Amino acid sequence: MPIANATTVHSDIDHGTKALYSKITWRLIPFLCFCYLAAYLDRINVGFAKLQMLEDLQFSTAAYGLGAGLFFVGYIIFEVPSNLILQRVGAKLWIARIMITWGLLSACTMFVTSTTQFYILRFLLGAAEAGFLPGVLYYLTMWYPTYRRGRIIALFMIGLPLSSVIGGPISGWIMGHFDQVQGLHGWQWLFLLEAIPSVLLGILTFWALPNHFQQAKWLSADDKAQLAADLAADDAEGKDSKHSFRDGFFNLKVWMLGGIDFSILLSAYAMGFWMPTFIRDAGVSDTFHIGLLTAIPSLAALAGMLMIGASSDRHRERRWHIIVPFIIGAIAMASSTLFSQNLVMTVVLFAIASAAIIGAVPVFFSLPATFLKGTAAATGFALACSVANIAGLVSNSLMGVVTDLTGTSHAALWVFAGCLILSCFLVIALPAKLVNR
């Protein structure tokens, strides 16, 4: 009888804990996912705008690549300061500020008439968005213990592929149907209309996000006590974690993570910004059809995120859930250069590459919080993202220059595939106690 009673109590506790985290997830993750969707859409819609604006404004492909890349200069410079401010003023205020300003600046791109204006606005857009992704990742560490974060980060980050699944067809439709409406080009309407959700979501942030679980009115006192106990136990398991700004900034493991993420983003941004061009080069001219086809690799990335993140949490293993997808993605991306005129093979290979490379991203982003806490976590998340986002400048600039020199945008993909393979050695070098929690 005592054994039966103990089993019943244990079952009740497990059920209560599951219900608690389910409640938190339904309250936070859908909203944050839509925010990330809006952010990434405003970041990469310039890839669709390129199909019209280069001819309208007489920009070269290299000028477009530089402008697309300058976003990341502003992003890199302001990433760490932005995340430290978020830690000081709270997620609610700072995420709202980020979203409203990036939405307004993205809309202003519709008024661009010169390369200088394009460069300035892309830089300012990067500065405005800086801190959003690492800020949300840091925010989630205040709600979920380490062993739950792989799946949760995957659920949050499905906003990334969803931005292309939803945004691709919508972007193509806007450019095709709004061209010359009220005397504006389709690409101008694109920047205006797709900025509106960011501003509206930024305003809603004031009501949707508590700064801390202790401020969540929808959690009971027992819920808060359970959550505090879970997070305290998680902190005890990572008792060697670092806490200060210095610990985050001068930690070799943070810089290693930045190098790994750099390799991820070289490929992710090449696919995100240039996928419409790859599909057009394979023989598709209609912008709406291009938008529909760009959704296929993004759907594959969404499935990859959910499956790889869930598997990693279930096995409490991170290293091989990163390495194996990297190898598969590198092979698929390099192979795509051999079929650049074949539409079916182009879409299939980029779908495989997207599912593997982007699918591993949530697992990767669960690593910093295994050895960083507090200010060090805020600094470490932002620093790793800052180092990595140099890839945005390198990727877009290299793609633009290579296209102007060779007439094709595919040659640079070999470089990006090689970087993914090299980053596998950095993953192997990370201590097992960090990658298997």
Curated annotation (Swiss-Prot):
It is found in: Membrane. Coiled coil: none annotated. Pfam families: MFS_1. Keywords: Aromatic hydrocarbons catabolism, Membrane, Transmembrane, Transmembrane helix, Transport. One of its GO terms (molecular function) is transmembrane transporter activity. It comes from the Bacteria. Induction: Repressed by NicR in the absence of 6-hydroxynicotinate (6HNA) inducer. In presence of 6HNA, repression is alleviated. GO terms for biological process: catabolic process. GO terms for cellular component: plasma membrane. It is a multi-pass membrane protein. The chain crosses the membrane at residues 28-48, 66-86, 93-113, 123-143, 152-172, 189-209, 254-274, 290-310, 320-340, 347-367, 374-394, 411-431. The keyword Membrane applies. InterPro entries: MFS, MFS_dom, MFS_trans_sf. Probable transporter, possibly involved in the aerobic nicotinate degradation pathway. Belongs to the major facilitator superfamily. This is Putative metabolite transport protein NicT. It comes from Pseudomonas putida (strain ATCC 47054 / DSM 6125 / CFBP 8728 / NCIMB 11950 / KT2440).
